[in-house]
């Protein structure tokens, strides 16, 4: 779900053609320890045109590197070396009076960048001053200001973006190399009858003199010159560069600089997305401009005071694979405002029409994204308590994010707090948590193992044919679910590690994330 404004309805994208003039030619709520010289591209394994599926079974579970992936380029950081003039990478429409609106390409002087994710800036163009989201700008005349530079994104994330069937052959981006410090990688979409849509990666090496090259016979003084050259000549690449890879605007960190507790009147509920035991989820808008998802909780579900206290902690959890908490209405009925994810809950996505086309590599990629988000939760010493497919949200390009972290602890419903009632997710809950209320990150690991069965069975309810009481009794006596049909034994072995009786013997999420990456992530061409 990436947020987008209601004007326009879809997420804003940016794309710039590099064709030379003389050429001819593309929800959630309802529903590091471990246990135990011609350019030679490193081609992506054969995908089909549907969703960029990889046909060949991956080396371990998935032939993807999904460590800490992102849905938009990482661009601006803290000011360094006295640089105070930045350029806008996207249009930004201010949502409150203290913010500053600007257009893509506008030059901005940074007045103060000490307040985290929102900087005080002065527009050279309009003469106005206000707060801007720091991830919408980059230092002027820097590589970060180039549309084709995507910074520190992973190989797998570049493939997820480039394998969009709407991209023409030659769509490209430049990113940091994952394997060589100081080097870059040129990732280019290609197509042929044998492999279908695929991505090739070329390592861009740096000369001692400061220049760049893919092959030593053709060298350039800057990355900009390299891109301009290969936009006119393939010269050993799979195809000359045609279009910059499109990407959505990044999420701002919060709705605005000081928007946290907001009035109910500022929200408009438009389309109901789902309903559950404790409330509903709506697609809506904030301040008439900003597309958001809104969770409405039934009165009595939780104490407003306890919720507000927990929300103060939750809003500090920021990771690319966690759904962002934007704002709250803290008086009953409580409203929770989060980023809008266009494809809804993972459970509904798996059971729906799109789920039919998902193959193992994509399912494992989704699992790795979830593990990445949970590894961050683990590092922050937080506990989710209700990790399951219904609480994972899906956006464009199969991006998955963890939602509803921490809310389960606050629910005051007797049928839920008894941990035996119909509303309590027994089938996803570790035995020590279900029986004794011992919720830890290790009970989240157990739940992740159950979530893996949901992925591999396209949303089947765990322990089919068994009631909650029977599940609790049999699991306590040592029963574990067998390997699902068409699930590799290696993946079932990972599930089994998550279901070890002793919580301390279960793996960490850091370990799980690593196991869901390819056995070797080296990029031959890099």
From Swiss-Prot:
Its EC number is 2.7.10.2. One of its GO terms (molecular function) is ATP binding. The modification Phosphotyrosine is found at residue 416. Homodimer. The keyword Nucleotide-binding applies. The lineage of its organism: Viruses, Riboviria, Pararnavirae, Artverviricota, Revtraviricetes. Residues 1-15 have a biased composition (Basic residues). This is Tyrosine-protein kinase transforming protein Src. PANTHER family: TYROSINE-PROTEIN KINASE. It comes from Rous sarcoma virus subgroup E (strain Schmidt-Ruppin). InterPro entries: Kinase-like_dom_sf, Non-receptor_tyrosine_kinases, Prot_kinase_dom, Protein_kinase_ATP_BS, Ser-Thr/Tyr_kinase_cat_dom, SH2, SH2_dom_sf, SH3-like_dom_sf. It catalyses: L-tyrosyl-[protein] + ATP = O-phospho-L-tyrosyl-[protein] + ADP + H(+). The keyword Lyase does not apply.
